[in-house]
Amino acid sequence: MQYRVDSKSGNRISALGLGCMRFPGAPGHPDAKTADAIISRAVEQGINYLDTAYLYPGNEVCVGASLERLGLRDRVLLATKLPHASCVCTGDFDRFFDEQLRRLRTDRIDYYLMHNITSPAQWERVVALGIEDWIARQKAAGRIRQIGFSYHGSAADFLDGA
């Protein structure tokens, strides 16, 4: 496996990550045995970056349980995402994040991403709700290690908002 070093954290991240959105199973009910096998095999092959999200039904629970059963939480960099569009007040950041920690059976998220930002206006909305101060508090408490975003808008809008 090839690795890259995150210059901000020093983390050595596998060039290939495991996107955990679509584990086999019924919608909202990923098959635990299959998820265990996929995660185990990925880690055996050197993958150490796992990506999930609040909005992937049943997924965070499945990933958290698999990591616990397999004893792999400390061997992976875990990424999940805030469903920012569902946040209407600052308290929602805590509500979603605390639920994510419970679902993932962990005390920290290595890479916490703002999910599916499609315009600079969406980012401005969560900034107005206090996301920057909230993130700073979570980082200071060690509950979030690094932050980021997944952007799904146009390149032109992104570059205009940068």
Spans of model-derived segments:
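N-terminal binding-site loop/beta-alpha segment at the start of enzyme catalytic domains
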Residues: 1-76, 140
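Structural preference for beta-strand elements that scaffold enzyme active sites
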Residues: 13-17, 48-49, 75-81, 108-113, ...
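Hydrophobic pocket-lining residues within nucleotide cofactor-binding pockets
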Residues: 23, 82, 117
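Glycine/proline-rich, positively charged
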Residues: 26-27, 40, 44, 87-162
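Generic structural signal for short, solvent-exposed loop/turn connectors between secondary structure elements
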Residues: 55-62, 82-94
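Short alpha-helix boundary/capping motifs
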Residues: 70-71, 79, 128-129
